[in-house]
């Protein structure tokens, strides 16, 4: 009986190890998009890891579509995993990127300088390059998703000048951004041909929905970007906890910035590029307040889960 038990445990462990694995890859630490576009070889090297999870019906002889996923400024939470599990149950592999833990950071709420959007976008492409070689991943069916800060990563991973600077041969086939910060508008509005969709709450004062609507409305008429604004929904509308105040977070409703072709976000007041932590804090501090509201709306959460499933099935499974 003991031998049989050991065999069962061994087989279970082998199955689990084949369906989920921790993967390391090389990235770096650019502070801004400008660092990637103009100084790609001057950045410090950084080892980053993530967890690759295969679909529930995993067969080691097959290849699967993949979603590379990024959490927000508070790191990974329960509601994020609900989406990943939903994708896995529908035949899609997921890769949970640990951009924060890889750099020894637990949260960037209220600062956004220890781990930046630029670092995470670079992580996304470096992860793509490695995972596209995996024997069970379909390199032509890789999408990206993220929440809040990770939503910004998802959105700007499609920005042409940045993508071309990192790897013009790598193409995400779908971008699903949850409540991203849309407060930066590039002078070059090139976001590629792959479908981009933004899900955001009407009442979001952390990453305001008005900014996303403004960005989408400025896009060229042939852009493949769309937007859903959920009524009566705050930031992190897909959390289970009710709305509450995040005292050290930023209220960004009054903040709008432009970004030049080199990837430098410009302080609108003085036309100064915010390419250092000090300048970024100064620029944001001049327009932002503290204490945004975040928390769940059960009805909206269910709508977002259903939309996410159908969006990814349409773009990764068809």
What spans do the regions from the language model cover?
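N-terminal cap/lid segment of alpha/beta-hydrolase-fold proteins
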Residues: 19-62
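Short beta-strand element of the alpha/beta-hydrolase
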Residues: 61-72
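Short beta-strand/loop motif that positions the catalytic acidic residue
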Residues: 192, 198-200
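Cap/lid segment of the alpha/beta-hydrolase catalytic domain
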Residues: 73-89, 99-119, 157-162, 286-290
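Short alpha-helix in the alpha/beta-hydrolase fold that links the catalytic acid
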Residues: 82, 207-218, 242
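Alpha/beta-hydrolase active-site loop
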Residues: 113-135, 156
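C-terminal catalytic histidine-bearing segment of alpha/beta-hydrolase fold enzymes
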Residues: 224-318
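Alpha/beta-hydrolase fold nucleophile elbow
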Residues: 137-148
């Amino acid at each position: 009986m003991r031998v049989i038990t050991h065999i069962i445990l061994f087989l279970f462990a082998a199955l689990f190890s084949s369906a989920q694995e921790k993967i390391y890859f090389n990235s770096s630490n650019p502070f801004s998009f400008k660092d990637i576009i103009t100084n790609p070889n001057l950045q410090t090297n950084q080892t980053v890891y993530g967890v690759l999870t295969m679909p529930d019906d995993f067969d080691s002889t097959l290849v699967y579509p993949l979603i590379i996923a990024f959490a927000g400024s508070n790191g990974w939470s329960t509601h994020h995993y609900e989406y990943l599990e939903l994708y896995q149950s529908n035949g899609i592999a997921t890769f949970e990127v640990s951009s924060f833990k890889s750099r020894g950071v637990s949260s960037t709420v209220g600062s956004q300088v220890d781990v930046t959007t630029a670092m995470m976008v670079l992580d996304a492409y470096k992860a793509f390059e490695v995972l596209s070689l995996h024997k069970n991943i379909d390199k032509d069916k890789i999408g990206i998703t993220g929440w809040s800060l990770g939503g910004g990563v998802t959105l700007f991973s499609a920005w042409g000048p940045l993508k071309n600077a990192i790897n013009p041969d790598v193409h995400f086939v779908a971008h699903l951004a949850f409540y991203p910060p849309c407060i930066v508008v590039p002078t070059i509005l090139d976001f590629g041909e792959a479908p981009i969709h933004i899900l955001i709450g009407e009442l979001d004062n952390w990453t305001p929905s008005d900014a996303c609507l403004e960005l989408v409305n400025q896009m060229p008429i042939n852009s493949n970007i769309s937007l859903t604004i959920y009524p009566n929904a705050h930031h992190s509308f897909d959390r289970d906890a009710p709305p509450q105040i995040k005292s050290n977070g930023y209220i960004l409703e009054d903040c709008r910035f432009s970004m030049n072709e080199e990837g430098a976000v410009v302080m609108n007041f003085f036309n100064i590029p915010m390419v250092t932590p000090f300048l970024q804090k100064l620029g944001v501090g001049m327009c932002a307040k503290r204490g945004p509201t975040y928390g769940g709306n059960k009805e909206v959460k269910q709508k977002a889960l259903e939309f996410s499933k159908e969006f990814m099935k349409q773009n990764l499974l068809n």
